Amino acid sequence: MASGSADHEDLRYRQCAGVMLANREGLVFAAQRIDSKNLGAWQMPQGGIDPGETQQEAAMRELEEETGVSADLADVIARMPYPVRYDLPEELQGKLWGGRYRGQEQHWFLARFTGTDADIDIAAHNPPEFSEWKWVEPDELPRLIVPFKREVYRAVVKEFRSLI
């Protein structure tokens, strides 16, 4: 599907929720996407909000699906007071989410991880979305994400930095 800028402008943003999971050492969880391994795309747990779900419920569901970390091991300590958006680059328009969205509007939560590394299982979801994971310094996150999501990650880090 070819998308002109007018078509792109008419599309909505997909509603999404994400979790910045911080450990006791002040590092945050990042995982490499299986479908973007050649791009080196790392990200935090995130995904679409299902009908009837609150933003926080969606964020915690995505956390468990993508990392195996249940809500009882992740204490939500903050919520970003405003959503952040990104637009898909032209080469991805029409390829993701059935071509129905121009990008995502993301609602972010900061959660303190109270478990151990053994509680993390990125193969918990079938099929898994991630090939590997690591703890990183918060300021390293924007460099790890695909370029079109960098401003979102900068905003999330800025918002939660003092609480990590």
Swiss-Prot record:
Q: Where is the Nudix hydrolase domain?
A: 12-158
Q: Which cofactor does it need?
A: a divalent metal cation
Q: Name one GO molecular function term.
A: guanosine-3',5'-bis(diphosphate) 3'-diphosphatase activity
Q: Name one GO biological process term.
A: ribose phosphate metabolic process
**EC annotation from Swiss-Prot or TrEMBL:** 3.6.1.-
Source organism superkingdom: Bacteria
Fetch the SUPFAM superfamilies from UniProt. Answer: Nudix
Pfam families attached to this UniProt entry:
NUDIX
Q: Does the entry feature the keyword Hydrolase, yes or no?
A: yes
Annotated keywords? Hydrolase
**Positions of short motif Nudix box:** 47-68
Protein's UniProt keywords contain Hydrolase: yes
Family to which the UniProt record says this protein belongs: Belongs to the Nudix hydrolase family. RppH subfamily.
Classification via PANTHER family: NUDIX HYDROLASE 26, CHLOROPLASTIC (PTHR11839:SF22), UDP/ADP-SUGAR PYROPHOSPHATASE (PTHR11839)
**Function comment:** Accelerates the degradation of transcripts by removing pyrophosphate from the 5'-end of triphosphorylated RNA, leading to a more labile monophosphorylated state that can stimulate subsequent ribonuclease cleavage.
Q: What is this protein called?
A: RNA pyrophosphohydrolase
